[in-house]
From Swiss-Prot:
<feature type="lipid moiety-binding region" description="N-palmitoyl cysteine">
    <location>
        <position position="24"/>
    </location>
</feature>
<keyword id="KW-0472">Membrane</keyword>
<feature type="transmembrane region" description="Helical">
    <location>
        <begin position="180"/>
        <end position="200"/>
    </location>
</feature>
<dbReference type="Pfam" id="PF02096">
    <property type="entry name" value="60KD_IMP"/>
</dbReference>
<dbReference type="GO" id="GO:0015031">
    <property type="term" value="P:protein transport"/>
</dbReference>
<feature type="compositionally biased region" description="Basic residues">
    <location>
        <begin position="291"/>
        <end position="310"/>
    </location>
</feature>
<dbReference type="InterPro" id="IPR028055">
    <property type="entry name" value="YidC/Oxa/ALB_C"/>
</dbReference>
<feature type="signal peptide">
    <location>
        <begin position="1"/>
        <end position="23"/>
    </location>
</feature>
<feature type="transmembrane region" description="Helical">
    <location>
        <begin position="34"/>
        <end position="54"/>
    </location>
</feature>
<comment type="function">
    <text>Required for the insertion and/or proper folding and/or complex formation of integral membrane proteins into the membrane. Involved in integration of membrane proteins that insert both dependently and independently of the Sec translocase complex, as well as at least some lipoproteins. Partially complements an E.coli yidC depletion experiment.</text>
</comment>
<protein>
    <recommendedName>
        <fullName>Membrane protein insertase YidC 2</fullName>
    </recommendedName>
</protein>
<keyword id="KW-0812">Transmembrane</keyword>
<feature type="region of interest" description="Disordered">
    <location>
        <begin position="263"/>
        <end position="310"/>
    </location>
</feature>
<dbReference type="GO" id="GO:0032977">
    <property type="term" value="F:membrane insertase activity"/>
</dbReference>
<dbReference type="InterPro" id="IPR047196">
    <property type="entry name" value="YidC_ALB_C"/>
</dbReference>
<dbReference type="GO" id="GO:0005886">
    <property type="term" value="C:plasma membrane"/>
</dbReference>
<feature type="transmembrane region" description="Helical">
    <location>
        <begin position="136"/>
        <end position="156"/>
    </location>
</feature>
Length: 310
């Protein structure tokens, strides 16, 4: 489940940043003004390449969009795979250390007092640091930040490059929304989500399948009102996402499992002893001593008062 949550978090963050970076392109009357760093340094050059392929080489805007998208996605594919590798390494290592973390999480869940909950949280953080685990499961931001200007520029250039709005591709008007491309995008991202569940343990697979419709629905909602030129970008990106997921399932993940097994065989995890519980016990003992001291003092004062009355 945590792995799926991280994937959804990653996808949601990517989409949010995409639209945020789209805001770096200044618009007027629904068209780019030519200002904004994303447009100047990324979208405009990509648009020029699209026009060159479409007009000078006679490939047409549809194939030009596909070619430029493929080239850019291939260039940033190593970054995407590096991101996936880090996330997968952390999740696989977490699965290996599940017997260590589960009891702590169970204590945190069943804590009856705020002190017990805080102690369990502290113990969990100490255990994560002890075993070299990241709280965010390897969800580093640098590869994502590097990729997002390219994603945003591709989307802008496929929507607003001059000539695309009036062009056609395989009988599809690139300047208007197209239901066929939208349906294909929905199916493609659904397959991608389904493939991602294949690497999940059988016990958790049913839960993950209930969540795998979120990304396809999100992509359909984005594509259904977008011009076909922009939707074509999402379609090609979906194909790359599926390829990346297959590489993860059949190459990266088995290799990392073998690597982690060898790491733990050579250097078995040392037993973790937390001092989080000890942080509360002395305080409790001090409180008891303070209460006892107050009672004894009160009893002595009461005895003196009785003696005085006598």
């Amino acid at each position: 489940m945590k792995k799926i949550y991280k994937r959804l978090l990653f996808s949601g963050l990517a989409l949010s940043m995409l639209f945020f970076l789209s805001g770096c392109v200044q618009m007027k009357n629904g068209k780019p003004t030519g200002e904004g760093w994303v447009y100047k340094f990324f979208a405009a050059p990509m648009g020029s390449v699209i026009q060159y392929l479409a007009n000078n080489l006679g490939l047409g805007f549809g194939f030009a969009i596909i070619i430029v998208t493929v080239i850019v996605r291939l260039l940033i594919l190593p970054l995407g795979l590096s991101q996936v590798r880090k996330m997968t390494y952390q999740s696989e290592k977490m699965a290996y250390l599940k017997p260590v973390f589960d009891p702590i999480q169970e204590r945190m869940k069943n804590a009856k007092t705020q002190e017990e909950k805080m102690a369990a949280q502290t113990e969990l953080m100490q255990a994560q640091r002890h075993y070299g685990m990241s709280m965010f499961g390897g969800l580093g931001c640098l590869p994502l930040l590097i990729q997002m200007p390219f994603f945003s520029a591709l989307y802008i250039s496929t929507r607003y490059t001059k000539g695309i709005a009036s062009a056609s591709f395989l009988g599809i008007k690139l300047g208007s929304p197209n239901m066929i491309i939208t349906v294909i995008i929905g199916i493609l991202y659904l397959v991608q989500s389904w493939v991602s569940t294949l690497s999940v343990p059988e016990a958790q697979r049913q839960q993950t399948r209930n969540m795998m419709f979120m990304m396809p629905i999100m992509m359909v909602m984005i594509s259904i009102g977008a011009p076909a030129g922009g939707a074509l970008y999402w379609l090609v990106s979906g194909i790359f996402g599926l390829i990346q997921q297959l590489i993860t399932n059949h190459i990266i993940k088995p290799k990392l499992r073998k690597q982690i097994d060898e790491e733990f065989k050579k250097n078995p995890p040392k037993p973790f002893k937390s001092n989080a519980r000890k942080d509360i016990t002395p305080q409790a003992n001090n409180d008891k001593k303070l209460i006892t001291s107050k009672k004894q003092k009160s009893n002595r004062n009461a005895g003196k008062q009785r003696h005085h009355k006598q």
